[in-house]
Design a protein with these regions (language model features):
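Class I SAM-dependent methyltransferase SAM/SAH-binding core
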Residues: 30-83
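A short acidic, Gly/Pro-enriched loop at the edge of an enzyme's catalytic core
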Residues: 81-94
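Short alpha-helix
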Residues: 153-169
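Conserved class I S-adenosyl-L-methionine
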Residues: 1-26, 38, 142
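A short SAM/SAH-binding and catalytic strip from SAM-dependent methyltransferases
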Residues: 93-107
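Core SAM-dependent methyltransferase catalytic element
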Residues: 169, 174-193
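Conserved beta-strand signature within the Rossmann-like core of class I S-adenosyl-L-methionine
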Residues: 122-130
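A short glycine-rich, Lys/Arg-flanked "PGG" loop and its adjoining helix->strand segment in the class I
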Residues: 109-121
Length: 193
């Protein structure tokens, strides 16, 4: 509950994106860093969703939202950089919203390897992340709030997610676009066939 309250000012922005970010997905979907389950209500009823999170607290909160969801959901306590409980070649989609900006850089290549392992050949991914702006005015504001954002949310604007995907032998980026200013970056891609 505390996290959802703390995140409320930003959620007013994110809630506009969730329906189109998730609503067109079909098949087996893995949500890495499922958090408190805020995305659940936006998945199509045909989706078979597996939600993975490292935090027991977040998973307990997410479990309360499963009943209100349209689709079948399984929650797993697992680390996105290891995914010991997730079988290979199973998923049509991987979704994560703000996972990589909270994941330390040293774990991101491992997480991306896991994404490639659990996706079916040609399976797709969609990652929504926060990055540093190139606009000086916005960047100054980000610099001012960066210590707070890192302390409270564990998020950083300087993660190298795009670089790690580009360096991956198994994943490729098929599209990148900003959803608001040049801070909220949507990265779309696929497992190479």
């Amino acid at each position: 509950m505390f996290y959802d309250i703390l995140d409320y000012p930003w959620e007013r922005i994110y809630r506009e994106w969730r329906p189109w970010l998730l609503g067109d997905l079909r098949g087996k979907v893995l949500e890495a860093g499922v958090g408190t389950g805020r995305n659940f209500q936006h998945y199509h009823r045909s989706v078979e969703l597996t939600g993975v999170d490292l935090s027991d607290v977040m998973l307990r909160k997410a479990a309360r939202k499963v009943k209100k969801a349209n689709c079948k959901i399984e929650l797993l306590h697992d680390d996105a950089s290891m995914m010991r409980l997730v079988d290979s070649n199973q998923y049509d989609w991987i979704i994560s919203t703000f996972l990589c900006c909270v994941m330390p850089d040293e774990f991101q290549p491992m997480a991306l390897q896991q994404f490639a392992r659990v996706l079916k050949p040609g399976g797709k991914f969609r990652l929504l992340e926060m990055v540093y702006s190139k606009n000086r005015k916005i960047r100054r504001r980000q610099d001012l709030f960066a210590p707070f954002v890192e302390k409270v949310y564990g998020a950083r604007f300087d993660r190298k997610t795009v670089q790690y995907i580009e360096e991956s032998a198994e994943l490729e980026i098929t599209g990148k676009r900003f959803l608001k200013d040049d801070v909220y970056l949507l990265i779309e891609g696929a497992r190479k066939v």
